[in-house]
């Protein structure tokens, strides 16, 4: 009974109190024409971003945007997009693998992320996410003849948008632990409709994860095309951990599979087994849970990005066609405790 009530309240108060969020939603659903850039113009845009970041002391040294290029437009290029509360350092080592294979690689820093005060990622606005997605797509268009995107968690949410609205820019799509929804539907509604619309003060869960930021990414997910069509996309690979308690696994599978079917793209969905000890966060090279598996994981991610069929590193579920399963135990346990108070 509470979910319809929350939705009704947000529909009344949200647009009234925050018309800027309505405008950002419109921008995401009907973006301006994505500007296709030459290599020189794309690098100039990146250099502007780097110069702006270098002009402030607010960004942690390891969290500046990263550009690894070969001095020319290459046959292949990739953009790597970090997750909510993360920063480009999470993709730095995987970027080396792509670069050594001849790719131009860009790892942009999400707005309000990677700051010395990491709690400020909760200040990110939906308009900033929209502008970030558009600018990143334009830069990608100039870096390589065949371009693609890989994202982690909320970065996969943005990568999915870029694939759909990038006017054919994206050919390859790698979605690591894509954040399309929290598992519990009530939690998902509350985070999106209340915190996404800034109707309550922000709360940090797990020590440094902003509910307002999570809500903005969920609002971005609402902007996806109803048919999920992603023009030009040739392959979509999804990888997550069975032990991930931060996202809805069914949504991760069903949303991505619908996009692949609608776009005529090759598709694979792989869950890493719980025996690996991985949770939500399967990319950060400094994560103690990732370190023991890092070399094999990164090799898997690279192969999956290229469209090569991969299997998990041990016995696991590898799913080609995933239907919605019966209800599972509630996830985001700390979020549950916060919301019940």
Please annotate each region the language model reported.
Residues 232, 238-241:
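Short beta-strand/loop motif that positions the catalytic acidic residue
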Residues 168-215:
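Hydrolase active-site cap/lid region
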Residues 94, 248-260:
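Short alpha-helix in the alpha/beta-hydrolase fold that links the catalytic acid
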Residues 115-143:
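Catalytic nucleophile-loop/oxyanion-hole region of alpha/beta-hydrolase
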Residues 59-110:
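Short, surface-exposed "cap/lid" segments of acyl-processing enzymes
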Residues 150-155, 159:
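Gly/Ala-rich beta-loop-alpha elbow adjacent to hydrolase catalytic centers
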Residues 243-247:
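Acidic catalytic loop of the alpha/beta-hydrolase fold
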Residues 282-332, 338:
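Catalytic active-site module of serine/aspartate enzymes centered on a nucleophile-bearing elbow/loop
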């Amino acid at each position: 009974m509470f979910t319809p009530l929350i939705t009704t309240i947000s529909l009344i108060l949200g647009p009234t109190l925050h018309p800027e969020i309505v405008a950002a939603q419109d921008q995401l659903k009907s973006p301006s024409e994505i500007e296709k850039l030459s290599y020189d113009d794309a690098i100039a845009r990146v250099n502007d971003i780097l110069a702006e970041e270098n002009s402030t002391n607010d960004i942690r040294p390891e969290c500046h945007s990263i550009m690894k290029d070969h001095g020319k437009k290459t046959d292949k290029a990739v953009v790597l997009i970090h997750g909510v509360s993360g920063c480009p350092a999470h993709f730095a080592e995987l970027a080396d693998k792509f670069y050594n294979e001849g790719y131009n690689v860009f790892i942009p820093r999400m707005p309000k992320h990677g700051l010395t005060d990491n709690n400020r990622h909760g200040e990110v606005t939906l308009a900033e996410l929209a502008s970030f997605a558009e600018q990143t797509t334009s830069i990608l268009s100039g870096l390589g003849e065949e371009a693609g995107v890989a994202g982690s968690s909320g970065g996969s949410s943005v990568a999915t948008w870029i694939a759909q609205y990038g006017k054919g820019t994206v050919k390859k799509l790698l979605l690591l632990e894509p954040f399309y929804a929290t598992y519990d539907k009530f939690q998902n509604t509350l985070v999106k409709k209340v915190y996404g619309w800034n109707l309550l003060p922000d709360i940090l869960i797990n020590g440094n994860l902003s509910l307002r930021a999570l809500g903005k990414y969920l609002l971005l997910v609402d902007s996806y095309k109803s048919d999920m069509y992603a023009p030009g996309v040739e392959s979509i690979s999804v990888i997550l951990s069975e032990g991930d308690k931060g996202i809805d696994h069914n949504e991760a599978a069903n949303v991505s599979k619908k996009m692949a079917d609608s776009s005529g793209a090759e598709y694979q969905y792989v869950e890493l087994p719980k025996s690996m000890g991985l949770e939500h966060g399967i990319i950060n090279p400094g994560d103690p849970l990732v370190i023991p598996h890092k070399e094999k994981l990164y090799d898997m991610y690279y192969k999956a990005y290229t469209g090569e069929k991969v299997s998990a590193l041990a016995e696991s579920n590898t799913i080609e066609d995933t239907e919605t399963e019966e209800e599972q135990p509630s996830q985001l346990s700390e979020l549950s405790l916060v919301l019940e108070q």
